[in-house]
Amino acid sequence: MYRSHTCGELRAEHIGQEVLLAGWVHRRRDHGPLIFIDLRDRYGITQIVFDSADSPVAHAVASDARVEYVLQVRGRVVQRPEEAYNPDIATGMIEVHATEATVLNPAKTPPLYINKEGGEEETLRLKYRYLDLRRERMQRNIMLRHRIVKFIRDFLDREGFVEIETPILIKSTPEGARDYLVPSRLHPGKFYALPQSPQQLKQLLMVAGFDRYFQIARCFRDEDQRADRQPEFTQLDMEMSFVDQGDVLDIIERLFTALCREIVPHKRLVTPFPRLTYAEAMERFGSDKPDLRYGLELVDVSDVVAASSFGVFRAALDTGGQVKGLRIPGAGSYSRKQIDEVVELAKQAGARGLLWAVVPGEGGEVRSSFGRQVSPDEMAAIIRRMEGAPGDLLLIVADPPKIVAQTLDRLRREFGARLNLADPNVLAWAWVIDFPLVEWNEEEQRWDAVHHPFTAPKDEDLHLMDTDPGRVRAKAYDLILNGYEAGGGSIRIHRRDVQQRLFDLLGIDRETAMRQFGHMLEAFEYGAPPHGGIAPGIDRICMILADEVTIREVMAFPKTQQAVDLMTNAPSPVDERQLRELHIALRLD
């Protein structure tokens, strides 16, 4: 036996007992005849006292030990002197006086600090991830993730869901991002794909009669990486039969309300979760995933300046654009240099420029970038519409609607952060519903599915599919949390004729549809029930609940933003023999 107790287990009731502990040297303090070692495992820390008078052999072991050595210690639990109590650790009332000690494994000096945050480059942390994971913060994050996943499993089991594993090697079908392809040795020239999601498989499980399915699913997407994306990620994959949109939203709301109250009880959340239509979210916030912990809503002044002769307004409005603004409370004290930095931020977001005005106090003059181009009445009308108060900074964008939305969304997030408007102890869950079914791809001159090609159109919009596809709304919904998309789902198409109509709209000809999705089309002819589902992202939700800023901090072994595993050096070249067995020749053009 290596240990009788963990390093976080001993309390006052253990005083007088002989115990056997094993763990890592967290800290070591040498006072000559007395050496103090904080012994650590994932459960906590216990202070070990090595006294040369009581046990010279154990003292000699402690004398040679260094940080991160793996030690086994036998000793007696003793109450600490009252002045030596440590309220910061659970074992702070006791210490163990060592009688025996064994070095189970020495350790080189670690390239990063384990017993404190060292501020190292992330590349170093990822290269030595097995050391980084020893840190208290990382152990806390991984344990939080475990508790979240366990809670989800237990909750869904009580709700009658069945956990079913779906294949990792599947057929390659277009789902938006690039597939990771796996060559088949047994079938030369053919490939499997790693699943971007179990979407088609879970729908087929509904056809099979498993009316409540879930899976903690590993998913893979070969896409350009962003701060909150990984090439492989984990989602809670769910599907239900004989449900409508309200049924899906209800169970997810109950799940995450209960989860947050259990796992992060110190955080506040509003229930029921607010519901915004896609059109409303874009109109009010310029985003389909707004952070609802603060206001800063967009204000449309297009009608206010409709008769203006100002060229910037005219150029936008005469070509179907918008003039919208954002009121930043108290930011009128910004210097010209600071305002110029905000203007540059708007340009980086895609805007041609950014108009600004500072609301004056009573009797004062408006300081602005466009005061000479508009009349005093027009300026006053803009300030009234935007509810400007003295000292406010008004920011205005005049551009096509898409540019206006993405620019003001970027500025809204920027000032939300600058003004500390987002309370970290608030969880602003919400739903965004009624997404468009399709969007026009200008570059390829065709319609693309906004979510995926199995999303059902709203019944009342079916008649528009042939005449005005851009106005067709989908039975789709996104779960958002603190400005992130936490999950997406929809009611699915379950009839072959409707599925074929959508394929036709997306420009997928009948032959291609049968080749890529024939298994789905055929299954729909064997009594497919109405069904729908959702796939919340485990990594993203864990990140937010852990108060981290990237999902890499809640994943045990993440990759870099360039999709590289610095610890194992993956991806890596393979032997020529392996390539020959797979009938593959490389052409590195």
Swiss-Prot record:
Report the subcellular localization: Cytoplasm
Where does the UniProt entry say this protein principally localizes?
Answer: cytoplasm
Q: Which GO terms describe its molecular function?
A: aspartate-tRNA ligase activity; aspartate-tRNA(Asn) ligase activity; ATP binding; nucleic acid binding
- From its record, what is one biological process in GO terms? aspartyl-tRNA aminoacylation
Give me the reactions it catalyses.
Answer: tRNA(Asx) + L-aspartate + ATP = L-aspartyl-tRNA(Asx) + AMP + diphosphate
Domain of life from the UniProt record: Bacteria
Which residues hold ATP? Answer: 221-223, 230, 485, 537-540
Give UniProt keywords alphabetically: Aminoacyl-tRNA synthetase, ATP-binding, Cytoplasm, Ligase, Nucleotide-binding, Protein biosynthesis
Transferase keyword on record: no
Which residues does the UniProt site feature Important for tRNA non-discrimination point to?
Answer: 31
Locate the region Aspartate: 199-202
Give the residues the record marks as binding L-aspartate: 175, 221, 451, 492
A GO CC annotation recorded here is: cytoplasm
| Pfam hit, one | tRNA_anti-codon
Enzyme Commission number: 6.1.1.23
Q: Which InterPro entries match?
A: Aa-tRNA-synt_II, aa-tRNA-synth_II, aa-tRNA-synth_II/BPL/LPL, Asp-tRNA-ligase_1, Asp-tRNA-ligase_1_N, Asp/Asn-tRNA-synth_IIb, AspRS_core, GAD-like_sf
Uppermost EC category: ligase
Q: How does it assemble?
A: Homodimer.
Function statement: Aspartyl-tRNA synthetase with relaxed tRNA specificity since it is able to aspartylate not only its cognate tRNA(Asp) but also tRNA(Asn). Reaction proceeds in two steps: L-aspartate is first activated by ATP to form Asp-AMP and then transferred to the acceptor end of tRNA(Asp/Asn).
Q: Which PANTHER family match?
A: ASPARTATE--TRNA LIGASE, MITOCHONDRIAL, ASPARTYL/LYSYL-TRNA SYNTHETASE
Q: Which NCBIfam families match?
A: aspS_bact, PRK00476.1
Q: Which protein family is it in?
A: Belongs to the class-II aminoacyl-tRNA synthetase family. Type 1 subfamily.
Q: What is this protein called?
A: Aspartate--tRNA(Asp/Asn) ligase
Q: Specify the species.
A: Roseiflexus sp. (strain RS-1)
Q: Which gene name does the record give? A: aspS
